[in-house]
């Protein structure tokens, strides 16, 4: 049954795409600290909003998080919509999904970007299902403007020039559809062996989760931070809306590998298979000397040589270190 969960706007219809406007970014915070990926997406969202000629809005959800709105404006947001409520202090799927879907059903953005963090990967599909729209997961590139998208294809694909030049429409339900205002979401497919570009032509908002680290964070602008418009959304939420309760937040004793933020990475791959123990040891020693971290290819992870948080590449984390050393990776 369509839209089984009640939304704040009972007349919401995702197929009436002409009613949707503006680009939104979910600005993820944890314990009052903004996630870096949120600033990356605000910077990317600024580009998309400019291409569409619309506003860029940051969506900030939590408890007493209004003070973070200014920093979101500093990276390019025109407006920050703040959803403040005590039950939003700690992330729970039920509470965040309800509030986000409520505000979207009322304000109707045409595009909604979410960081592909653990929270974003949980939240995105739930919201897309409730809002009866499409979600492209784990994106590494976004475009709206066709000339810009075509330039991207020329540099990132093997498509012939005639094929790229002829792109203007797509077949949707057997009819030609003008893709000029559609968000073009590119992501790895088939285990990272191909890149696929996906559009959501029949419903809005177009939703995408985006890998942390793939979008460039803009320079912070103090003037924009001071000028950002802050709108407080009237959150309607009570304990009955939640099926779970966060009793305590315990930080992991084991520190996860920060590949995305690392300046120096030493990665290992299939080529160390003749001496895995020696290869891994060498990688760690070199990483320690450089003050960096150890990464690995998909083969290294699938073979159990390293844990999944070390994986680099199309099917792992996208990284931008100052120095990247590849051992046994072709």
Spell out what each predicted region is.
Residues 1-330:
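N-terminal glycine-rich FAD/FM-binding segment characteristic of electron-transfer flavoproteins
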């Amino acid at each position: 049954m369509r839209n089984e969960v009640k939304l704040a706007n009972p007349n919401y219809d995702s197929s009436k795409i002409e009613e949707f406007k503006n680009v939104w970014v979910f600005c993820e915070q944890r314990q009052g600290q903004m996630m870096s990926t949120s600033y990356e997406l605000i910077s990317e969202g600024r580009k998309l909003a400019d291409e569409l000629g619309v506003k860029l809005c940051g969506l900030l959800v939590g408890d007493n998080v209004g003070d973070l709105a200014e920093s979101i404006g500093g990276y390019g947001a025109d407006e920050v919509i703040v959803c403040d409520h005590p039950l939003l202090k700690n992330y729970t799927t039920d509470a965040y999904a309800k509030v986000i879907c409520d505000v979207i059903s009322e304000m109707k953005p045409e595009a909604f970007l979410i960081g592909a963090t653990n929270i974003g990967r949980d939240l995105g599909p739930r919201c897309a299902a409730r809002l009866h729209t499409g979600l492209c997961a784990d994106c590494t590139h976004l475009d709206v403007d066709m000339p810009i998208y075509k330039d991207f294809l020329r540099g990132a694909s093997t498509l012939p020039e005639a094929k790229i030049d002829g792109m203007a429409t797509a077949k949707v339900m057997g009819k030609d559809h003008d893709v000029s205002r559609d968000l073009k979401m590119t992501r790895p497919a088939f285990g990272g062996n191909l890149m696929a570009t996906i559009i959501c032509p029949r419903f809005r908002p177009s939703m995408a989760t985006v890998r942390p680290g793939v979008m460039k964070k803009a320079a912070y602008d103090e003037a924009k931070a001071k000028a950002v418009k802050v709108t407080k959304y009237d959150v309607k939420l009570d304990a009955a809306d939640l099926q779970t309760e966060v009793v305590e937040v315990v930080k992991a004793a084991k520190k996860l590998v920060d590949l995305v933020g690392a300046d120096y990475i030493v990665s290992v791959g299939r080529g160390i298979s003749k001496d895995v123990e020696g290869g891994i040891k060498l990688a760690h020693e070199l990483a320690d000397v450089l003050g960096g971290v150890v990464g690995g290819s998909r083969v290294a992870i699938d073979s159990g040589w390293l844990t999944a948080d070390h994986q680099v590449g199309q099917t792992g984390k996208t990284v931008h270190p100052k120095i990247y050393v590849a051992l046994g990776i072709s």
